[in-house]
Design a protein with these regions (language model features):
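A detector of single, family-specific signature residues
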Residues: 1-244
Length: 244
């Protein structure tokens, strides 16, 4: 029904379940929605959310219902169509369970690293992106200064004629670790979506966006600032630990 995944942005749960997939399993045909009255659908959707322990939004229900009323069904609402949808849902759930199991394993492995608590306390980082960052950056002591770690990621701003760093316009570099840059961009995306007002990286991103900087400029500049803070916090924390 519709491109239903675009209506839900909830992350997958630890058991692999996803709201949009569960929705598609219940409302497997557009007629499952549009044949109801709007009030009946809202009530049905609210009860479904309670039963599945998902957040309910009346405006979201109204949006979905309005879109469903505009659509013309391509496939008939019959047992064959229902079977096709069920098989697709089962495959999606199976893949999601595997992914979430791997994420759990990654997090358990990363939790044994000494820098784990300080990295996980950073805004924009969670049980998925945190372990990715630690794996891709490795031991921060191998970087002699903050500029070395940003160069490693390919988000260093470069040097101006006076020899000092210039951050007015920061393009994405083709050098460095593309995997780390991707993870850093994902962290920036989380910050933009969650907008933690007290976070210095988000404040910096918000300022650059307000200045109408191009997407890759403000994302790379934000990644640069995040990495510098990461480097400083992790080094300081590790230095404070008693020697083993």
């Amino acid at each position: 029904m519709l491109t239903i995944h675009t209506y839900f942005d909830s992350p997958a749960r630890s058991d692999g379940s996803q709201k949009w997939v569960d929705f598609a399993s219940t409302y497997w045909h557009v007629d499952c929605v549009r044949k109801m009255s709007i009030n009946a659908f809202i009530d049905h959707y609210e009860n479904w959310c309670k039963r599945k322990k998902y957040n309910f939004s009346k405006s979201k229900a109204e949006e979905i219902y309005g879109k469903a009323k505009e659509l013309v069904p391509v496939l008939p609402k019959d047992d064959i169509t229902k079977l096709i949808i069920k098989q697709a849902v089962d495959q999606l759930n199976s893949a999601s369970i595997t992914v979430e199991s791997l994420r759990t394993l990654m997090n358990e492995t990363a939790s044994k690293l000494p820098e784990y608590p300080v990295v996980m306390a950073m805004k924009g980082v969670g049980t998925s992106l945190g372990p990715q960052l630690m794996a891709e950056i490795g031991d921060v002591s191998r970087f002699t200064h903050k500029g070395a770690i940003t160069a490693f990621a390919g988000v260093d701003p470069g040097v101006n004629e006076s020899g000092s760093y210039e951050q007015k316009s920061v393009p994405t570099s083709k050098r460095g670790s593309s995997d780390l840059r991707k993870t850093l961009f994902q962290v920036m995306d989380v910050l933009i979506k969650t907008h933690p007002q007290d976070d210095p990286v988000y404040q910096f991103l918000d300022k650059k966006r307000a200045q109408k900087k191009p997407y890759y400029v403000y994302m790379t500049a934000g990644a640069n600032k995040f990495l510098r803070i990461y480097y400083g916090r992790v080094k300081e924390y590790l230095a404070s630990l008693p020697e083993s």
